[in-house]
């Protein structure tokens, strides 16, 4: 497997891999990673569909990319997905997956046209004082110390950031900047999250720094991620004869190490209450989704808080399977699951879905986002953060294009909200969010969008239906780590197995993204089948001088460097540098970026 860039490799079709007709594949998990692995086995590996088996414990494919309606409780959306124009593997996949809504076009075409006609951007990024615009005004407000610390983090080798928290590499002044408000609420980082992962994010998305304050860098699907992404991919695979076997609770993969050649020999699973096995030969390829950020999700509804009695550090079936596999390693080559699942107080947050058709509530929404959510277009354009809830629930909410579900009533609006601090009291509801019913969570949200307090209780009870989801491991992959804590996609010496998903290690890319999961799926197939075509490399904006200069300009709130407060020595050095670059292409680049006038 090798990486490539450019259209030469991207547009080419690889030759059929040697002996692929003799091979079979068993894919554990049907999240984006597993479905993508199956896609590349079919399209580029040219494996027969009937040789590909997807093993899924649940009754529905999609993993964490779900979206569903419970006929007794209402709509549930555990989370949403933000996409980027440089999700290279994602778009390589969906350019060949037919749309299930628009005949004759691909999912990518449909998505591209949608976001061209209805581009995403926010008109209010944050509020204070019950729905008033916080006027972040697209500014980062980075002080010099914070800006220098971010620059240092950007340039620090990953090895030097292993097992470090963000709070260990950034100054106290950073936490009060707009940059941190944007960053934390958009990506769900915490101060105790991995400094290594924050560095990866900075490097990966430096080309989008101008679109960070108003989300103009983002693109969204038409419907929820299940109907817009998972379902078309499942239909594609089924059309090619791929089998999805539901109710398959995989407990272990037995791996034998034969003088450094590591061979998966058996899959152990439970089906219909009985333990069974699948015996494997070297031509049977196994793709293992190790760990799951939505494991042990706890659901609540309008009148019930989620039951958290089963939440314990390290508890969860996906972690149990990974631990069983990791215990077979001689030198830790299958990762260290305990690093990610042993502190639910650090890794949890909670989301809720509010369904309403109430005109009065919708008017309060429109006062903030300046758009009518019933028009079928971008509404909030990303999350609206309640800035004065930072020391409380730290609430953010969003309304994507409506309807979010094809079955949704045309007058209904679905609001998704989430809280980073589930253990703290709300500003209005004096309870921890995790202890609240859906109705109580709705009250807190109504308070923050400006509904008068005397109307809140009645509207939350009679005009809204709120479902909730507490996720103890949703931020597990943000835990401080070292490279070896996640297994390589294909560990050294592995003959017929790979790890895929958010807890497999691949260079440079960032977790908590659709692209990361899909990339591991592609890399695993290309490695095990030795497909002779390049895997598109992670977009290299951190290596592009033009992008870096542009990022500097926006990071200092669109000011020329001459307007920055500098010491006498720094001013003298700047004069020397400007004299050296005068009349060169460097001067032109500095002018184009806005750093000099």
Write out the residue ranges for each language-model feature.
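Rossmann-like flavin
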Residues: 100-207, 219-220
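Amphipathic alpha-helical segments that form well-ordered structural scaffolds
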Residues: 89-96, 182, 228-239, 440-448, ...
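C-terminal segments that line or cap access tunnels to active or ligand-binding sites in enzymes
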Residues: 206-221, 283-285, 290-520, 526-540
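Short, glycine/acidic-rich hinge or "gate" loops at secondary-structure transitions
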Residues: 104-112, 246, 533-543
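Extreme N-terminal leader/targeting segments of oxidoreductases
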Residues: 1-25, 43-51, 69, 551, ...
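Helical element adjacent to the flavin cofactor pocket in flavoenzyme catalytic cores
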Residues: 203-285, 289-291, 303-304, 309-319
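Beta1-alpha1 glycine-rich phosphate/pyrophosphate-binding loop at the start
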Residues: 1-3, 37, 41, 45-85, ...
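N-terminal glycine-rich phosphate/pyrophosphate-binding loop and immediately adjacent elements
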Residues: 13, 19-149
């Amino acid at each position: 497997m090798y990486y490539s860039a450019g259209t030469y490799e991207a547009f080419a079709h690889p030759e059929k891999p040697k002996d692929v007709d003799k091979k079979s594949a068993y894919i554990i998990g049907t999240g984006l990673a597993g479905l993508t692995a199956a896609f590349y086995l079919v399209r580029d590996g040219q494996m027969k569909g009937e040789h590909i088996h997807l093993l899924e414990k649940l009754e529905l494919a999609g993993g964490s990319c779900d979206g569903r309606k419970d006929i007794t409780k209402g709509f549930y959306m555990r989370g949403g997905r933000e996409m980027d124009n440089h999700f290279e593997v994602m778009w390589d996949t969906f350019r060949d997956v037919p749309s299930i809504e628009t005949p004759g076009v691909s999912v990518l075409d449909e998505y591209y046209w949608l976001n061209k006609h209805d581009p995403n951007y926010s008109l209010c990024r944050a509020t204070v004082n019950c729905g008033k615009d916080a006027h972040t005004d697209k500014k980062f407000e980075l002080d010099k110390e914070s800006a220098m610390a971010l620059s240092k983090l950007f340039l620090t080798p990953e090895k030097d950031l292993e097992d470090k928290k963000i709070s260990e590499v950034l100054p106290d002044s950073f936490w009060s900047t707009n940059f941190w408000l944007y960053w934390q609420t958009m990506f769900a980082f915490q101060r105790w999250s991995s400094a290594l992962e924050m560095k990866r994010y900075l490097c990966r998305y430096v080309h989008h720094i101008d679109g960070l304050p108003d989300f103009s860098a983002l693109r969204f699907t038409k419907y929820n991620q299940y109907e817009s992404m998972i379902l078309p991919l499942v239909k594609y695979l089924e059309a090619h004869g791929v089998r999805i076997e539901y109710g398959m609770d995989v407990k272990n993969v037995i791996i034998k190490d034969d003088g450094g050649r590591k061979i998966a020999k058996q899959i152990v699973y439970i089906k219909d209450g009985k333990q069974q096995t699948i015996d494997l030969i070297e031509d049977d390829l196994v793709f293992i989704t190790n760990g799951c950020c939505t494991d042990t999700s706890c659901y609540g509804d309008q009148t019930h808080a989620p039951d958290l009695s089963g939440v314990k550090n390290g508890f969860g079936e996906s972690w149990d399977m990974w631990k069983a596999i990791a215990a077979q390693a001689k030198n830790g080559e299958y990762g260290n699951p305990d690093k990610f699942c042993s502190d639910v107080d650090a890794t949890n947050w909670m989301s809720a879905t509010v369904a309403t058709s109430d005109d009065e509530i919708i008017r309060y929404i429109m006062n903030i986002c300046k758009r009518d959510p019933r028009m079928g277009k971008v509404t909030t354009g990303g999350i609206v953060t309640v800035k004065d809830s930072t020391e409380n629930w730290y609430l953010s909410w969003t309304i994507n294009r409506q309807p979010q579900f094809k079955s949704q009533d045309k007058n209904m609006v679905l609001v998704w909200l989430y809280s980073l601090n589930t253990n703290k009291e709300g500003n209005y509801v004096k309870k921890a969010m995790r202890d609240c019913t859906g109705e109580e969570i709705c009250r807190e949200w109504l308070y923050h969008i400006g509904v008068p307090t005397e109307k809140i209780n009645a509207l939350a009870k009679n005009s809204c239906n709120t479902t909730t989801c507490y996720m103890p491991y949703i931020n597990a992959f943000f835990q401080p780590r070292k490279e070896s804590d996640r297994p390589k996609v294909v560990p050294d010496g592995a003959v017929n197995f790979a790890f895929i998903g958010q807890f497999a290690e691949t260079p440079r890319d960032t977790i908590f993204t659709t692209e990361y999961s899909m990339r591991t799926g592609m890399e695993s197939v290309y490695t095990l089948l030795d497909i002779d075509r390049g895997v598109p490399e992670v977009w290299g904006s951190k290596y592009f001088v033009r992008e870096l200069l542009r990022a500097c300009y926006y990071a200092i709130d669109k000011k020329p460097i001459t307007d920055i407060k500098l010491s006498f020595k720094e001013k003298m050095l700047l004069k020397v540098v400007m004299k050296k670059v005068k009349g060169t292409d460097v001067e032109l680049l500095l002018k184009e970026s806005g750093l000099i006038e």
